[in-house]
Amino acid sequence: MDPRQSRITELAIAIKKQTETLQSLLDSLKVATPSFSVNANQELPRNAAVQLAQSSILDSCTELQDLVEGPLAHVGRIMSPRVHISSALQAIVHFNIAEKIAKHETISFGEIAKRCKMDVDDVKRIMRLAISYRIFKESHIGFVNHTASSFLIAENLLVRQWISLCCDEFIPAGSFLVPAMKKWPSSEEPNETAFALLHKGDSLWEVLKKQPEKAQRFAHGMEYMRTLPPFDINHLFTSLNWEIDCEMVLVDVGGSQGSIAEALLRRHPRLRCYVQDLPETLSKAVVPKDLKGRLEFVSHSMFKEQPIKADVYLLRSILHDWLDGYALQIIRNLIPALEVGSKVIINEICLPEPNAISAYEAQLIRGYDLSMKQQFNSKERDVHEWETLFRLADRRFKLNRIVNPPGSFLAVLEFEWQPTTP
């Protein structure tokens, strides 16, 4: 870069080049340019080159916006209006606003209020904030249409459940983080959290056990997260690098309603899977017809001794819910079932070193880490913390490999049980 150029000029030039690269890739793949149209694609192709270009653009644009705003406006804008859009989205989902509008319909605020049984002024204020985020559009004064984002909310149950989970539970819990840290400094207990203060002492797990409808919503929310590109199941396939016809028995520990196991089974026709979770989580789990005889749901607490002998034990986004004392219990409960060469595969965020990834990605990953603190008193771990955790659990665990697939937030850490290890 020319040393005489300002940083904002450098970023503008970089964004132009990055955008041209992305457009060229989309043209070569015969994919339409991104747009806000209701008919637009919901995401860019899950192609490594496309995702790299996309990530570069987003990081450059974020930095440029932050610089141009200046620190006074930047800090202010983080708090408002970004905080308030969550309230608008909560109302949009609660009152089924997006679902009440047909895909190509133009509708007045008054008609929306009538269909959703709302005050018309409330509708107008909520909708116009959402519109500023390009969720709906006001085609002419007082009349709105769907955009790509609003129609996604209308047609995708998992998106609505994720919004509801965040707005009803996670975001309100955030306001109790400081009181929880002051009341229970250094606590590892799941009922001494910001979430527990919000829920009169109940941990998130206790709330889910008492309220099946919330357990179902939580399961849907986690399923939505798995649909996002950084959590794509194909990253797991790439990292495992198993032969298609591999013949193994796998236990998916805390596998919820089986979406990961189903994907693995359909990719590997000789694989057999047991999905373990609590009874309330499995209450609505169903084995698909094409997987009968190969997939089984088993009620089991990971805090009890593992009853199933298998070749592989998969823990995907499980241990980050627990600080070390509890995580060690979970790992040690696997040991009675392990045989020489048994694998324990951890599919979790492996926190990068500072400045190793873009600020745009770091905001997401560090946000997940703080969310773990708020909800569970737990955390995301870096590679040294993962190695230390398994060494403390039992020195007979050997770390075979760590894979960080490009474009994925989840690493694969493969530990092998070697009881002869000194």
Curated annotation (Swiss-Prot):
Induction: Expression is positively regulated by the KK-1 cluster-specific transcription factor kk1F. This is O-methyltransferase kk1A. GO terms for biological process: methylation; secondary metabolite biosynthetic process. S-adenosyl-L-methionine binds at D277. PANTHER family: PUTATIVE (AFU_ORTHOLOGUE AFUA_4G14580)-RELATED, STERIGMATOCYSTIN 8-O-METHYLTRANSFERASE. Belongs to the class I-like SAM-binding methyltransferase superfamily. Cation-independent O-methyltransferase family. The active site is at H320 (proton acceptor). It comes from Curvularia clavata. Pathway: Secondary metabolite biosynthesis. O-methyltransferase; part of the gene cluster that mediates the biosynthesis of KK-1, a novel cyclic depsipeptide with 10 residues which is a promising active compound with high activity against many plant pathogens, especially Botrytis cinerea. Within the pathway, kk1A is responsible for the O-methylation of tyrosine as a free amino acid before its activation as an aminoacyl-AMP by the corresponding A domain of kk1B. The gene is kk1A. Disruption phenotype: Prevents the conversion of free tyrosine to O-methyltyrosine and, consequently, the synthesis of KK-1. Does not affect the incorporation pattern of unmethylated normal tyrosine by the A domain of the 10th module of kk1B. InterPro entries: COMT-like, O_MeTrfase_dom, Plant_O-MeTrfase_dimerisation, SAM-dependent_MTases_sf, WH-like_DNA-bd_sf, WH_DNA-bd_sf. Keywords: Methyltransferase, S-adenosyl-L-methionine, Transferase. It is an enzyme of class 2 (transferase). Its EC number is 2.1.1.-. GO terms for molecular function: O-methyltransferase activity; protein dimerization activity.
